[in-house]
Amino acid sequence: MVPTIDMGIPGASSSVAHVPTRRRVLLAEPRGYCAGVDRAVETVERALEKHGPPVYVRHEIVHNRHVVDTLAKAGAVFVEETDQVPEGAIVVFSAHGVAPTVYAAAAERNLQTIDATCPLVTKVHNEARRFARNDYDILLIGHEGHEEVVGTAGEAPEHVQLVDGLDGVERVTIRDEDKVVWLSQTTLSVDETMEIVARLRQRFAKLQDPPSDDICYATQNRQVAVKAMAPECDLVLVVGSRNSSNSVRLVEVALGAGAEAAYLVDWADDIDQSWLQGVTTVGVTSGASVPEVLVRGVLERLAESGYDMVQPVTTANETLVFALPREIRPAR
């Protein structure tokens, strides 16, 4: 008898034997919430507990429809700009970070601010300020219009040039070849970013690297796990929202690593049964802003379709935890 591991899903188990002819799910580990998302979501929850609703949140706290809808039902009010927040009210800044001008606008309206910016995004902000003080040209690799990019660029608007994909490389101009550095959005594809850096370095031989890797540990870990399982997958399902950069990148990584097909789904109801025709192995993962309950829903739906064996594919163990913002930490 093939030994199995109970996965806590009706009808699903993880076999330690390779049975390629039986319908199965390869489940990426790690997946889902990263430390920054966990901190941001808990920040809004704690603010609601401490102050009661409404608690205003500038932009989606994280890029996931389920999370935003759940917090909205609990009393969070999501706005695009601080001028939509009543004077003197509480406003939480999202995990993606904000530019200094946003803090200034909040202060003018006497808003009580709680900063849920991911500490790894804050690190990139600090790097941008430091290099700007030293009069560097900063080449920021990222997606135009993404909240994180807007926030980072806002730290040093006169020094930052956005490089959005390989096409953006040729548009870059610099003042001093000895004073040019690249930084990046934290949720990009590692491979694509390194390709852009290599192209930039062909133009600017003295291009400096950031002091430490800007692409966050969770983004990298989730991409590595997908790369490990994709070659064995007929189909990869990435649980995540379409405005989630890191989730979209996982679909691209899966296809690039050998999966025959890959799709982004917000939840189980998004699965098109035609995708499963002729499919033996389905890979499942989730973006860094996705709660595990949505992954469980997908696994249950797959089990109903005969994919009742779940095999974990573990490439890293994550233990990092970030402290909550001081404004909502429990009293000692």
Curated annotation (Swiss-Prot):
Reactions performed catalytically: isopentenyl diphosphate + 2 oxidized [2Fe-2S]-[ferredoxin] + H2O = (2E)-4-hydroxy-3-methylbut-2-enyl diphosphate + 2 reduced [2Fe-2S]-[ferredoxin] + 2 H(+); dimethylallyl diphosphate + 2 oxidized [2Fe-2S]-[ferredoxin] + H2O = (2E)-4-hydroxy-3-methylbut-2-enyl diphosphate + 2 reduced [2Fe-2S]-[ferredoxin] + 2 H(+)
MF GO annotations: 4 iron, 4 sulfur cluster binding; 4-hydroxy-3-methylbut-2-enyl diphosphate reductase activity; metal ion binding
TM annotation in the entry: none
Associated pathway: Isoprenoid biosynthesis; dimethylallyl diphosphate biosynthesis; dimethylallyl diphosphate from (2E)-4-hydroxy-3-methylbutenyl diphosphate: step 1/1; Isoprenoid biosynthesis; isopentenyl diphosphate biosynthesis via DXP pathway; isopentenyl diphosphate from 1-deoxy-D-xylulose 5-phosphate: step 6/6
Record-linked CDD domains: lytB_ispH
Residue sites binding [4Fe-4S] cluster per the record: 34, 118, 216
Residues involved in isopentenyl diphosphate binding: 63, 96, 146, 244-246, 289
Family matches, as InterPro entries: LytB/IspH
Broadest EC class assigned to this enzyme: oxidoreductase
Cofactor, free-text remark: Binds 1 [4Fe-4S] cluster per subunit.
EC number(s) given by UniProt: 1.17.7.4
Binding-site residues, (2E)-4-hydroxy-3-methylbut-2-enyl diphosphate: 63, 96, 146, 186, 244-246, 289
Cofactor(s), by name: [4Fe-4S] cluster
Highest taxon of the lineage: Bacteria
Active site per database record: 148 (proton donor)
Binding site for dimethylallyl diphosphate: 63, 96, 146, 244-246, 289
Keywords: 4Fe-4S, Iron, Iron-sulfur, Isoprene biosynthesis, Metal-binding, Oxidoreductase
Biological process per Gene Ontology, one example term: terpenoid biosynthetic process
Function description: Catalyzes the conversion of 1-hydroxy-2-methyl-2-(E)-butenyl 4-diphosphate (HMBPP) into a mixture of isopentenyl diphosphate (IPP) and dimethylallyl diphosphate (DMAPP). Acts in the terminal step of the DOXP/MEP pathway for isoprenoid precursor biosynthesis.
Family stated for the protein in its record: Belongs to the IspH family.
UniProt-recorded name of the protein: 4-hydroxy-3-methylbut-2-enyl diphosphate reductase
Gene that specifies this protein: ispH
